Amino acid sequence: AKRVCKDGGKIFFSFISNDFVFLTEFGYDVNYFSNGDYDKETFKLNDFPFVFHTVGAARKLLADGGINILHEVASDGASELLAARINEMSDEDYTQYLRYHFYICEKPELLGMTNHLLFMGEKK
């Protein structure tokens, strides 16, 4: 995408967040912290079949690639963990939940608490 984007053009990038996957996997396997497929010292997930990035690593990858980051978004937050509960919500509660999600999804202190990160960048 960067090769065909003009200087100053906008590009969206999506990453799988390394750090929140642990809680998602723990939801499926109570023993994930002892038998999960990750480095037990660094907490780096093994990049198969997906590639995982921390927020910092994603930022560095974009900066090193000549991308100026304009927005950073925790795309789904805890929604995957709470999917069953969210599906049970009334329309009124769901509307308020979405308002809450949009309220917190760009807070820097919560960017790592999501399975998916979305970056909006600009080609330098």
Where are these regions (language model features)?
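Conserved S-adenosyl-L-methionine
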Residues: 55, 59, 67-78
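Short glycine/proline-rich turn/loop motifs
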Residues: 38-43, 102
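Acceptor-substrate binding/catalytic loop of class I
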Residues: 41-57
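Conserved class I S-adenosyl-L-methionine
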Residues: 10-38
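A C-terminal cap/extension of S-adenosyl-L-methionine-dependent methyltransferases
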Residues: 71-124
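A short glycine-rich, Lys/Arg-flanked "PGG" loop and its adjoining helix->strand segment in the class I
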Residues: 1-10
